[in-house]
Amino acid sequence: MKRTTLILLSTFCLLISACGTSSAAGPEKTVEAYLNALNEKDSTRLSTLSCADWEATALMELDSFQAVSTTLEGLTCAQTGTDGANALVTCQGKIVASYNGELQEFDLSARTYIAENSTGEWLVCGAQ
């Protein structure tokens, strides 16, 4: 009886630990995190989520939002294709920027993000 309980408990613990070590988030979750970091004006997180070649562009985009208040509305992203080893991700929703009471909306569906998984984690590496 003790042996059966021990085996069942060990199996249960193994299954629980396997659930906790799922693979890294997909490219769509990385793009969502990237856009959230942009909205929250988190340059450190934005850099972490960007490829080295895209980082300067990402930080330039961030600079363009520094003087305005932003909100992110209706964000959902999905992988819509591939380009070689890269994933193509499109998003729905918008960034609404407010400056001196004037609102400007940036439609997120106007761009397709390019995500790359060359380091074991998905990173945003461009947009088209």
Predicted feature locations:
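Exposed beta-sheet edge and beta->alpha loop/turn motif
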Residues: G81-Q128
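Solvent-exposed, acidic/flexible segments
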Residues: A24-V31, N39, Q104, L108
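Short helix-adjacent coil turns
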Residues: Y34, L38-L46
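Positively charged n-region of N-terminal signal peptides that target proteins for export
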Residues: M1-T5
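Bacterial signal peptide processing site
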Residues: G20-S22
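C-terminal motif of bacterial Sec signal peptides marking the signal peptidase cleavage site
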Residues: L15-A18
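Repetitive helical segments and hydrophobic/amphipathic motifs
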Residues: T11-F12
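Short solvent-exposed beta->alpha transition segments
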Residues: K29, S43-L88, Q92, Y99-N100
